[in-house]
UniProtKB/Swiss-Prot annotation:
It comes from the Bacteria. It catalyses: 3-hydroxybenzoate + NADH + O2 + H(+) = 2,5-dihydroxybenzoate + NAD(+) + H2O. Catalyzes the conversion of 3-hydroxybenzoate to gentisate. Its EC number is 1.14.13.24. Residues 1-25 are annotated as: Disordered. Its cofactor is FAD. GO terms for molecular function: 3-hydroxybenzoate 6-monooxygenase activity; FAD binding. Pfam families: FAD_binding_3. Residues 16-25 have a biased composition (Polar residues). This is 3-hydroxybenzoate 6-hydroxylase 2. Induction: By 3-hydroxybenzoate. The keyword Flavoprotein applies. Keywords: Aromatic hydrocarbons catabolism, FAD, Flavoprotein, Monooxygenase, NAD, Oxidoreductase.
Amino acid sequence: MRSTNTRSARSRPTKRSVNASATPTQSFHRVDAHLSLLEGAEETGWVEFKTNTRVERIEQDADSVTVYDQNGNAYRGVALIGADGVRSVVRQTYVNDQPRVTGHVVYRAVVDKDEFPQDLRWNASSLWVGPKCHLVHYPLRGGEQYNIVVTFQSRQQEEWGVTEGSKEEVESYFQDICPKARQLIGLPKSWKRWATADREPIPQWTFGRTTLLGDAAHPTTQYMAQGACMALEDAVTLGEALRVHGNDWGKALDLYQRSRITRTARIVLSGREMGRLYHAQGVERLVRNSLWKGRTTEQFYDAIQWLYGWNVDNCLSESI
């Protein structure tokens, strides 16, 4: 971790595992993860994809759930897993709350290795922090590409969504940072812009034979870098709950919910605090740097054991 005036505040050996049985930290391209999941779903022979389809209405009884799309088509099943994102129709049906727009904007771009500065080709996730902004970069696909992610606190009113980014806008927020970090801002030929949002954690997301998963259940800011990870954990936990309870969907969905609510709520709330720490200024910045510098490597790993110590063998433990 470096400040945007080039002074290093703290570094950690991310290749080292959190505990003796854990695997080292790895980063990969999200598209590659999507393709692996798609291939796995197709290989089962049980999955039928309906694209360009929006759920408009949900009905359920004691034995089944039926969803109706925008064209009036009905789809009936034994359960409904709402994994339909931040603006979840399934969540809106049963919870009826609204996303909390943070005012923090994220710009993302991927750059080929040959275009990335030689002196910044570190085989690690690297974080530059500054007042009301931060910048992250890390290698993808064995170092053949680098992901650049910059975040700033917007000067304007934001609405949640993803749009094409403006090079002029992102440069205007990072014009005063040190040259070594600022050179990264000019590399991408195009940017994607996210106006971020989360939601308040809720104590229930299973309703009869319907439940929520991923961003539909617990949308979070990017500061813990756990949005996609939590969705994958949800899926694994749901699978384990079904293994325990067989075809009893009521018990399985209840076990799944009880296993996930506390952990995912902690991610959402921790993300908000990490955003404050990353963007600290003035005396608060000095306190942050002092706290991070004062931790030993062992203390650092102890502090994140709760996050990275999760695995399939303990995923149901919080509910028991």
